Regions:
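Charged, terminal alpha-helix-loop-beta segments
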Residues: 1-256
């Protein structure tokens, strides 16, 4: 058993409490983006492959609707809430997550129910925010990396256009800026679930899927009915049976 597989149970512990309804709905734990960040990414790192993480990140888009197109190697490092002192100011910056391999660095700022920290001067001529401050971390500490990017991770309904436009205008061109939605992860895990993975991984993936469902962090697929979806069958003794087949389930009704 390799180190990542051996750590599955340990990495899974922090969300078991919530999956079994042990957390009050009004608890600050439920609304904490730090808890969400550590639960999701803390558990993804224990999968034997980075394929789920990479497929999730590939769903991030920039202002031209181009997808994030860098995949991390197996030698990926996760840095949670690491503190960085600026080399030009006295400010300390603490990104939610930094992903790093030999050639790439990615800073992920995770939001759940809070907003991006923005600062304006009195006459609003000067503007900065968390993402811009994090770009100085890349310049100061990761300038040797070939691929340098920032992802803003939010709920699907988060209004990002204005703040990201302001950010892109002031961000160095060599640093990519992307937007990603928490809801995109669910389908990535469902695809991975179909692969030939170990029992431990299946259990972990299932737990994360349940967690995302509880938090309502998945897209509603909806139901679309057309007359072509219905089939009628006549059975003896005046029993009629019809079925409607949808993408995700089959609904049946029997009338006698």
């Amino acid at each position: 058993m390799d180190a990542r597989t051996g750590a599955l149970n340990l990495g899974n512990l922090e969300m078991i409490y919530e999956l079994h309804g042990k957390i009050p709905q009004n608890s600050s734990f439920v609304y904490s983006e730090d808890v969400l960040t550590s639960t999701i990414f803390g558990n993804l790192r224990y999968l034997n492959s980075n394929s789920v993480l990479n497929s999730f990140l590939l769903k991030a888009i920039d202002f031209q609707n181009n997808n994030f197109n860098f995949e991390f190697s197996k030698d990926l490092k996760f840095h949670f809430w690491r503190k960085y002192s600026s080399k030009t100011t006295v400010q300390i910056n603490e990104p939610d997550l930094i992903l790093e391999d030999e050639n790439s660095v990615l800073i992920i700022e995770c939001k759940y129910h809070s907003f991006l920290d923005e600062t304006f001067s009195e006459n609003k001529s000067e503007y900065t925010n968390q993402l811009l401050r994090y770009s100085t971390i890349i310049n100061d500490y990761y300038s040797n990396k070939k691929n340098k990017n920032i992802i803003f991770l939010t709920l699907k309904d988060y209004e990002v256009k204005e703040c990201l436009e302001k950010t892109r205008m002031k961000l160095p061109e060599k640093i990519g800026l992307y937007w990603l939605k928490w809801e995109e992860l669910y389908s990535c895990l469902k695809e991975y679930e179909k692969c030939n993975i170990s029992t431990g991984e299946k259990n972990l993936v299932n737990d994360i899927l349940q967690f995302l469902s509880i938090r309502k962090l998945k897209y509603f697929s909806g139901i679309n009915i057309s007359k072509n979806n219905f089939s009628w069958k006549y059975k003896r003794n005046y029993k009629y049976k019809f079925a409607s087949k949808f993408d995700s389930f089959t609904w049946r009704y029997n009338y006698e």
